[in-house]
C-alpha cells in the first residue's frame, strides 16, 4: 500500500508492522492458504518455495512464519535469499540476510529452523495471537521483538531474553546460538555467537560487531555504498553460566583458520573479555 502496489516504489522498514491479520486470513481463507488444509491436498507434498520476509529485519518474523507454515502442512522450506559476505556489506533493500550483517535475523532464522523441525504439521494454529506466541519449547514476540527455542540440547534466541516468562531453559545444553543477552550467556557485543558444549570443552565462535552506516532498507545504487561495516578487534565481556562450568580451572585457546590453537590464559570462572573469533575452552 505504501508503494501504491508497486514493488519498486516501496521503501521502508516493516520490522515493527503487525502481520497478525495477514496470518489470520492466510490460515482461515480458502482462497489464500486455507486450501492447503483440505482433504484434496492431504496426501500431497508441501514445500515452501520462498521462506522469506519483505523489508523486515525483526527477531520474530522467521519463527512466526515457520510456525504458520507447519500448521498448513509444509514439510520443507527453501530460504529465498542469502547475501554472500563478500558483497553483503553493500546490500540493502527488500531482501537482506547474512550471518554477519544481519545478526538478529540470522539468530531468528536459527530459531525458525528448530521451530520448523520440532512442530508437528497441521497442528491447530493460534489465530487469536499469530504475532505473539509461547509454547513449551519456543516463543516469538512482535511486542518484545525476540524469539527463543529451548530444549534439553539446544538454546537458540534472537534479541535479549533475560526474562524467559514461563519457558524452562536447560542449564546444560549441547549448543547455544544467540544474539543479545540471555540467562545462560551474557554477551555485550553486537554480533552473533555460537557455543558447542561437551563435558570437557566448549567451542566458542563469535562474529564481529556490526556497524550500520545506513538502514538495512537502504538501496545502494550499483552497490557502491557500504551499508554495514565490521569491527573485528573490539573486545566485549562474555559471561557463560551453564551447569558443570560454574568454577574450576579453565584454559582458553585461540583457534586459527588452519586449525592450530594458541593458549591465551587460564581462568577460574567463565567471565571473559573476548574479541570476535573462534576459541576453545577446556577444563584443566
Predicted regions and their residues:
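A general structural signal for short secondary-structure junctions and capping/turn motifs
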Residues: 37-39, 68-70, 195
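Glycoside hydrolase catalytic-domain groove-lining segments
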Residues: 1-55
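C-terminal beta-sandwich/jelly-roll accessory domains of carbohydrate-active enzymes
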Residues: 156-284
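Mature, folded catalytic cores of secreted/periplasmic enzymes
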Residues: 1-3, 12-13, 70, 90-120, ...
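Hard-cation-handling environments
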Residues: 141-151, 156, 162
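Substrate-binding cleft of secreted/luminal carbohydrate-active enzymes
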Residues: 55-134
Amino acid at each position: 500500500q505504501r508503494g501504491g502496489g508497486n514493488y519498486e516504489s516501496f521503501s521502508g522498514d516493516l520490522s515493527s508492522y503487525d502481520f497478525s491479520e495477514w496470518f489470520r486470513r492466510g490460515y482461515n481463507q480458502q482462497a489464500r492458504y486455507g486450501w492447503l488444509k483440505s482433504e484434496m491436498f492431504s496426501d500431497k507434498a508441501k514445500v515452501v518455495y520462498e521462506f522469506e520476509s519483505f523489508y523486515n529485519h525483526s527477531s520474530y518474523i522467521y519463527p512466526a512464519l515457520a510456525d504458520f507454515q507447519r500448521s498448513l502442512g509444509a514439510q520443507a522450506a527453501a530460504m529465498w535469499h542469502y547475501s554472500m559476505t563478500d558483497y553483503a556489506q553493500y546490500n540493502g533493500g527488500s531482501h537482506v540476510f547474512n550471518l554477519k550483517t544481519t545478526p538478529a535475523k540470522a539468530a531468528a532464522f536459527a530459531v525458525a529452523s528448530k521451530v520448523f523441525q520440532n512442530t508437528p504439521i497441521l497442528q491447530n494454529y493460534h489465530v487469536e495471537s499469530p504475532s505473539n506466541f509461547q509454547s513449551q519449547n519456543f516463543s516469538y514476540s512482535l511486542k518484545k521483538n525476540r524469539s527463543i527455542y529451548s530444549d534439553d540440547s539446544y538454546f537458540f534466541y534472537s534479541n535479549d531474553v533475560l526474562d524467559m516468562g514461563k519457558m524452562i531453559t536447560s542449564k546444560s545444553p549441547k549448543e547455544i546460538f544467540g544474539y543479545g543477552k540471555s540467562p545462560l550467556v551474557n554477551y555485550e557485543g553486537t554480533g552473533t555467537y555460537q557455543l558447542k558444549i561437551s563435558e570437557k570443552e566448549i567451542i566458542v565462535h563469535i562474529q564481529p560487531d556490526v556497524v550500520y552506516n545506513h538502514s538495512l532498507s537502504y538501496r545502494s545504487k550499483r552497490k557502491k555504498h557500504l551499508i554495514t561495516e565490521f569491527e573485528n578487534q573490539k573486545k566485549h565481556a562474555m559471561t557463560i553460566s551453564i551447569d558443570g562450568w560454574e568454577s574450576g580451572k579453565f584454559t582458553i585457546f585461540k583457534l586459527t583458520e588452519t586449525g592450530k590453537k594458541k593458549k591465551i590464559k587460564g581462568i577460574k570462572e567463565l567471565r571473559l573479555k573476548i574479541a570476535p573469533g573462534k576459541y576453545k575452552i577446556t577444563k584443566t
